[in-house]
Amino acid sequence: MTKVTKTKTYGLAKNSVWSSRASSIHVEGGTVYMAGAVNVINAGDVPVYWKNKVQHELEAEFDLKKCDYCKATPNDISVVKNDVIAVGDYYDESDFVDNYYTNGENKAALWVNKKLFKLCECCGSSSAKSVVVMDCSNKSC
């Protein structure tokens, strides 16, 4: 694993970053987008995407400084009409189904322009692995 993040993450100094990883890449024209996570020491994984090497944090509704088992991981990224769309997994320890941290359930998540939408809060375990977006505004799809 390589540290590619050289910026402040989750409000903490850049030397607080332990590692970062990209799980998906999307090229739109000459712009490169990557989705992934940055591991911050004593906080956990912060969901992010990079646009031409500039890091953007994705929304998470939990406080990683207080939540040992929470995570949000984007698995794929796409762009349509300048809207950045990422999908992945979301896990909040306050949503435990029992007293064992390992028995909680991942929920499918969607981020549109950094804003989080949980796709299936009422169903069991779910996950979003890939996103395909088509612009059909000027033609019939």
Give the location of each predicted region:
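Residue-level hotspots at or immediately adjacent to binding/recognition sites across diverse folds
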Residues: 1-141
